[in-house]
Amino acid sequence: MIIIKRFLHIKTVPKSYGNQLSKFKYSKQIPTHEVLTKLGYITYPRAGLVNWSKMGLLIQNKISQIIRQRMDEIQFEEVSLSLISHKELWKLTNRWDQEEIFKLVGDEYLLVPTAEEEITNYVKKQFLESYKNFPLALYQINPKFRNEKRPRGGLLRGKEFLMKDAYSFDLNESEAMKTYEKVVGAYHKIFQDLGIPYVKAEADSGDIGGSLSHEWHYLNSSGEDTVFECNECHNVSNMEKALSYPKEIDETIEVSVIYFTTEDKSTLICAYYPSNRVLEPKFIQNEIPDIDLDSINDLSEFNHDISTRIVRIMDSRLSSRSKFPDFPISNFINRSLITTLTDIPIVLAQEGEICGHCEEGKLSASSAIEVGHTFYLGDKYSKPLDLEVDVPTSNNSIEKQRIMMGCYGIGISRIIAAIAEINRDEKGLKWPRSIAPWEVTVVEVSKQKQLKNVNDNNHHNNPQDNFQEIYNILNQANIDYRLDNRSDSMGKKLKQSDLLGIPLSIILGNQYPIIEIEVRGNKKNNNNNSWLQSYTENKDQFDWKVETDAQGNDTKHYIHKDGLVTVVNSLLNDM
């Protein structure tokens, strides 16, 4: 009889695993970007540049797969555009002169920081043959580049970053808004899949442009952004979008004024606000849409022009008794040309002020890390790039229809940095199950102890044969594990698995077929213990025992090998 021995594939830790740990003394005070380097996830060859190891790529790929699944569900198609773009398109959209653009030698090309120009040009060349090609929705996952002058924070602000950028193309605004809401729904699912609490905040569109946008944030004290949430209507807005009213007015406050004009220069705008606050000119735009947001310092051109119209806009923190500066145009006497707008919030909000959205609740401020942004662009790019399609009308004629666009970004490398920052403790990182490089580290008792146990107990079975049975079980159950087959001690291996943030560790020791499982990962929402239901149903069958800490959190599980898959899956489902 011929016996065919089945080849057993055992997945082991990468070569980069633990390489830098022998001299690394972890402390929670060490910046997260340094921790990621010491743990072997990434390296920085130069400030702002990053190399990814196998372990870092495993996390990248899991996040990318979550994004792909949710974007595919809403019928976005994946593409991959060139990372180099010609200046011609960027001049048409007035973005060629932005400081953060990486221009190549010869000043003809750039490394793309985002792809609105190129994707619009791609659609123009490929899909304008028929209006029936719309709606159209595309996305890509690839590197982007920013000429960051002072890179800092590792992956949070570098010269290169991994990004998912998506773009939608609709025949009208109504359909474009439906697409926007569809993407917002997909983003909620993506961030829920990632397993870390997040907020969606109303936002200013900034350099990207457009009339509607939302930012997606992780709340954390290290974040460079600030978001405000109302305790009544629960509106969440970023700093540049949060309108607020004072709890009470300080009539003794000093008043400052900054001058603007309308775009046609026919009207002088005087913005009065408390000297101890920060004016946000875009808030004035809510009342005066045609304001030129570049302030002016020289008012001499208005000194002799008595036909100039003047609008005075008063911040809501001021009253008629406030200490206003003198009016700058001394010979202006035509008061019929002066319009005064009062009680208008035009300064950046502060914590504890009244919500400008519902005008009832109080605002609380939180530091946050931005990891995603959704924009409704309208014709911001389709107009200068002439993206129009022939559409039949009701009277059987043909008319040009300008395409309405949206764009939607997620910073994959930023997510990795942010989650690493948020999910740290005194032992190291704590990756959510959804993006951990692997879910379970397997550690075997040393070969010497295996042999000693066989000799002491007169066992005939080779422990390695028993352990290979476990790898078969894990492989068949599609559990994402890695065996730490390095020569270090078991204690050191377990400590390093904790440090690197792997959710679970399985210990194959001398008590086999009883297996020990150590719990490292956080529970979702900090209160999800669905494993308890499985424990109640299976504890006797699998000889399942549990150790807890002083707070009642499960830290170790002991189970018979026959219950390994059931227990591991029930624990991972909580993480």
Curated annotation (Swiss-Prot):
Pfam families: HGTP_anticodon, tRNA-synt_2b. Keywords: Aminoacyl-tRNA synthetase, ATP-binding, Cytoplasm, Ligase, Nucleotide-binding, Protein biosynthesis. It is found in: Cytoplasm. It comes from the Eukaryota. Coiled coil: none annotated. Its EC number is 6.1.1.15. It catalyses: tRNA(Pro) + L-proline + ATP = L-prolyl-tRNA(Pro) + AMP + diphosphate. GO terms for biological process: prolyl-tRNA aminoacylation. One of its GO terms (molecular function) is ATP binding. GO terms for cellular component: mitochondrion. InterPro entries: aa-tRNA-synt_IIb (IPR002314), aa-tRNA-synth_II (IPR006195), aa-tRNA-synth_II/BPL/LPL (IPR045864), Anticodon-bd (IPR004154), Anticodon-bd_dom_sf (IPR036621), Pro-tRNA-ligase_IIa (IPR002316), Pro-tRNA_synthetase (IPR050062), ProRS_core_prok (IPR033730). Belongs to the class-II aminoacyl-tRNA synthetase family. This is Proline--tRNA ligase, cytoplasmic. It comes from Candida albicans.
